[in-house]
Amino acid sequence: MTFAEDKTYKYIRDNHSKFCCVDVLEILPYLSCLTASDQDRLRASYRQIGNRDTLWGLFNNLQRRPGWVEVFIRALQICELPGLADQVTRVYQSYLPPGTSLRSLEPLQLPDFPAAVSGPSAFAPGHNIPDHGLRETPSCPKPVQDTQPPESPVENSEQLLQTNSGAVARMSGGSLIPSPNQQALSPQPSREHQEQEPELGGAHAANVASVPIATYGPVSPTVSFQPLPRTALRTNLLSGVTVSALSADTSLSSSSTGSAFAKGAGDQAKAATCFSTTLTNSVTTSSVPSPRLVPVKTMSSKLPLSSKSTAAMTSTVLTNTAPSKLPSNSVYAGTVPSRVPASVAKAPANTIPPERNSKQAKETPEGPATKVTTGGNQTGPNSSIRSLHSGPEMSKPGVLVSQLDEPFSACSVDLAISPSSSLVSEPNHGPEENEYSSFRIQVDESPSADLLGSPEPLATQQPQEEEEHCASSMPWAKWLGATSALLAVFLAVMLYRSRRLAQ
């Protein structure tokens, strides 16, 4: 960082409140001096801590890049912040050495910048403007990459699809040299020609538009360095007609890329011929595999298998328009005998790329295959488990439910259930029946109102009641004896006085 850039950074840091109006997400696409990883981190910080705190990280990342002041001033003018741009320009020019030409800052004073940035334009060589200062159109500049990016595979793929010769690709520098990505891109157009129907073979140019080209905004390394997407290839795998009975002499040659494209026209004609043969062979119901089998040759783990390497698997080729994940078609499920080999049912899976072969093998259900081969009893594995549970064992809760109409009084100890084996046809519930019978004897005795709230058992309350009856009967006997004794004494005294008076 130069002296003028250091002083400019200190000015921005001391006057940070003036720059709070700068929107980080709006100005990021125009800061071409920042790398894509820096812009990704700033966007993540913007979502977490907001715009005001992210400005500190933005200025810290800017001051580590050479020539950041001129880029920042240009970005401020594009974002319609001319006041801040003039302040930064004045401070930056004041610390520059005398006599320094500011050729890069002269276009910034011209008011020919549009207010809004135009959308993404078509990627064409004629639209490129030579770099002479900052007089180019104010479109979003390409961010600085962390590492040296490889040559764009999108441009090479467009030229390969349009010319269909593919021997030489034009690089970004303008020189004509063999493309390093040509061999990796060659199987895709040939595969698209083989998977399409014969009448749609000439419409391969429409697939060029399916590859999006983003020419605006920063692109992270994980997005900008990815290979070509294979969406068009997977769409053709699902919508195209499965052509599996091709001759072995038309296998894909990986020795030279030019010969692979030279065979493209011949492969289309052979694919049309083989498609007509598969329509005639699909009428028959023979399950004898063809004696001529060609082993599958995998060229690379990232390249899809050519459908020509799966030549002549069986003579009963299903003419299904969309290859299903099931091993066999539902139309032929009833006609295939049980002795059909497993290779016949799993043959259509070879037309899928190798990276999807292992996944589809795991996702393939085994239910339809067993129905075709066995054709017998289709009882599931749960039938053996259900047969283990006998009738009395399943009806055990019914015995307990029948006693719910009676009042219940017991503790948690009385509810212990004896262990019983579910495999025994007649389980023994002796301890439970004895406990429940004791409950029935206790419940039949209607308890009194005084004993309902008592926690003690009924048997301990009965002797106490008998003692109370005996204790209550003792005073009445004593009073009766005392009264009879007094009455006898009174009668004796009266009798004695009557005799004395008579004498």
From Swiss-Prot:
The gene is Mavs. Adapter required for innate immune defense against viruses. Acts downstream of DHX33, RIGI and IFIH1/MDA5, which detect intracellular dsRNA produced during viral replication, to coordinate pathways leading to the activation of NF-kappa-B, IRF3 and IRF7, and to the subsequent induction of antiviral cytokines such as IFN-beta and RANTES (CCL5). Peroxisomal and mitochondrial MAVS act sequentially to create an antiviral cellular state. Coiled coil: none annotated. The record marks D405, E406 as: Cleavage. Residues 143-147 are annotated as: Interaction with TRAF2. One of its GO terms (cellular component) is mitochondrion. Both CARD and transmembrane domains are essential for antiviral function. The CARD domain is responsible for interaction with RIGI and IFIH1/MDA5. The transmembrane domain and residues 285-420 are essential for its interaction with DHX58/LGP2. This is Mitochondrial antiviral-signaling protein. It is found in: Mitochondrion outer membrane; Mitochondrion; Peroxisome. It comes from Mus musculus. It is a single-pass membrane protein. Following activation, phosphorylated by TBK1 at Ser-418 in the pLxIS motif. The phosphorylated pLxIS motif constitutes an IRF3-binding motif, leading to recruitment of the transcription factor IRF3 to induce type-I interferons and other cytokines. The lineage of its organism: Eukaryota, Metazoa, Chordata, Craniata, Vertebrata. The modification Asymmetric dimethylarginine is found at R234. Residues 356-365 have a biased composition (Basic and acidic residues). Residues 337-503 are annotated as: Interaction with DHX33. The modification Phosphoserine is found at S152, S157, S172, S186, S220, S251, S256, S384, S418.
